[in-house]
A protein has these predicted regions:
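Short, compositionally stereotyped local motifs that mark structural "simplifiers"
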Residues: 6, 14-194, 218
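Conserved ATP-binding subdomain of kinase catalytic cores across diverse folds
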Residues: 149, 160, 165-282
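Secretome/extracellular-domain signature
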Residues: 1-5
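Short Gly/Pro-enriched turn/cap motifs at secondary-structure boundaries
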Residues: 12, 62, 202-204
């Protein structure tokens, strides 16, 4: 903005990730770069990222498994840059000091969440890859779709966690995979998403089982809208930027679908507006 508060220059962008800035480098330049954040300070001292690494590839896709298997992880980046492939098996975000994948297959013997990531070890101008997620559930079968939600433990618990601070509107990063209710629960989609608590203080927030809102196209933490028919009784709706994972409020432990069922029955055959729903196991 100039001295009269008129826009002097603007740029519409989509952030590549939450911990990366986009700005002019050097200051007042016409060149726009990915930068290390320098809030309130000059961009002249920021590290400039010229490229990003490709994410690792897992040999077995997320889903339901019935027996133990060996998991292999592939680094798809060419040999022009020195990299390190790391992983975790507890759902936490990999760091450069996490376990290094050396090429030896990882034995998966029970339900496991793996996150893998690739870092440049020498060239600081390369952004680390996005995380690759694999969630393997052993001998699971549901009559409902299954929604797999992975996030850092301290995003939920502790002084900065949204479970332990359920009255906050804090937004956290997560990854979601949707498995359909068809035989074998095939994957419908997976994506990065933002998550936050939702609902009223009298039920949806305060009870041990909480309600979430997922924002698939969140500008910093999400990825894109979901172009799928997620709720069967409104097949004309095939684009979702948000969904509400509702715990059933005061009926959360006895009849969590009560409100949704009553509303659906009262709206059947009428032109009344109502909230459609699809039961899901999370």
């Amino acid at each position: 903005f100039d001295e009269s508060n008129a826009i002097a220059s603007s740029l519409e962008i989509t952030s590549p990730r939450a911990d990366v800035a986009i700005g002019r480098s050097p200051d007042n330049s016409d060149i726009i770069e990915w930068l290390s954040p320098t809030p309130g300070a000059t961009n002249n001292t920021a590290n400039v990222f010229t490229d990003e690494l490709l994410p690792p590839v897992l040999s077995v896709a997320t889903g339901i498994v019935n027996s133990s298997f060996d998991l292999e992880i592939t680094n798809p980046n060419a040999g022009g840059v020195e990299t390190k492939l790391v992983y975790t098996l507890d759902g936490s975000e990999p760091t450069i000091t996490s376990d290094t994948y050396t090429g030896t297959p990882i034995a998966i013997n029970n339900s496991t969440v793996i996150r893998a990531k690739i870092f440049a070890t020498v060239d600081e101008n390369y952004l680390p890859s996005f995380d690759t997620y694999g969630t393997y559930l052993f001998d699971v079968e549901h009559t409902t779709p299954i929604l797999l939600l992975t996030t850092q433990n301290d995003n939920l618990y502790g002084p900065d966690g949204i479970f332990d601070n359920y009255n906050s509107d804090w937004v956290k990063a997560a990854h979601v995979t949707y498995l359909t209710k068809e035989a074998g629960h095939p994957t419908l989609f997976e994506t990065r998403t933002a998550i936050r608590m939702d609902g009223g203080a009298g039920g949806s927030r305060a009870y041990p089982q909480h309600s979430f809102r997922l924002s698939f196209d969140h500008a910093a933490l999400g990825e894109e809208t979901i172009n799928e028919q997620l709720i069967p009784n409104i097949p004309f709706r095939d684009k979702y930027s948000d969904v509400y994972l509702r715990n059933g409020s005061n009926q959360w432990l006895t009849f969590p679908h009560k409100d949704a069922c009553q509303v659906s029955m009262m709206s059947n055959g009428t032109n009344n507006y109502y909230s459609a729903m699809e039961p899901v196991s999370v």
